[in-house]
Amino acid sequence: MPYLTAHVLDRVNEWFVRARLSGRMSSHCGTSMVEHMKGLGEAIHPSPQILGGFEPEQVSKLLWKTSSPWPGADGNNKTWYAERFVPRSRTSSSDFDQTLAAGGKEHSPALILLHGWLIDRPQLPIYRSWARHAARRGIEVWMPFLPFHMQRSEPGEISGQRALSPNLSGNLDMVRQGVAEARLLARWLRGRTSRVGIWGMSLGGLVAALTTTLDDDWDAVALWAPVAEPDEVLFNSGLVEFLREAVIQSGVSKDDFAAPEIASMMPNRSDTKIDPSKMLVVAGDYDQVVSPGSVERLSRRWGIEVHWVRHGHISLMLSRAPVRYTANFLEHTLFA
């Protein structure tokens, strides 16, 4: 895609985000994120075993839900939702249920697909098309909604409105919750399927990347435009300019993100536990949200080659070729 087209799409998205969130963003900056993380100690990323029960139940043909065991989750955010896409080789969800009842293992590997910030109903078809690309290759796909998104937002709120705000401590807690829930789902799936992979876009890429720094049993990992350096997005991206102004006025600087207490929330300051051969990173040469430089630094630290495409942040999501490339990688890796 030509640079100008990709650039314009990202700029239009910036305007659209500002318009949607205008007057909705709280100016409350909360407690110091460094002190907040310091107070958590070793509980920054609690293990699935510590968090306890997680048993999704089917509520419709596509939708599943369960109660999130995340401490402090309340309101609509207390309920975890996911859409499940049946592999092409299977014809009905009843087959899946009967297999579980028999205590057997699914022959199809599973994939957790994590969306980006501010996903709403008009964007759902995009992510669903990605899921179906993988499902057509015999992969069972689960697409959970991240905290404060879709059904997990409160009445009158924009989907994802509370996921990113001047309250940086709250933002980090949202990411921590997303990481914990992805690990809980993976643990649940590993008792039922042969292999489990994860694919995340942007914010979802941040969550997916962090799970690989905690668990070594992911069988395939695909990171699309992952937020490898959250501080770089906050202080450099035009997408969150309105948020940056409030954060700077509160006295927060980029130096605060260099604190050791924040390292476990920053992919570029953590090490993955996954073999590079099982990982794919896809990024756009023209991305105005997640800079190519931050992705390149992540690839060097983790020893992963980046599949660069001539796209920006938004045009990457709309392009079919990277989806096919990623689905082929996942099929090859999960069925290896």
Regions found by a protein language model. Name each.
Residues 107-116:
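Short beta-strand element of the alpha/beta-hydrolase
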Residues 210-255, 308:
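Hydrolase active-site cap/lid region
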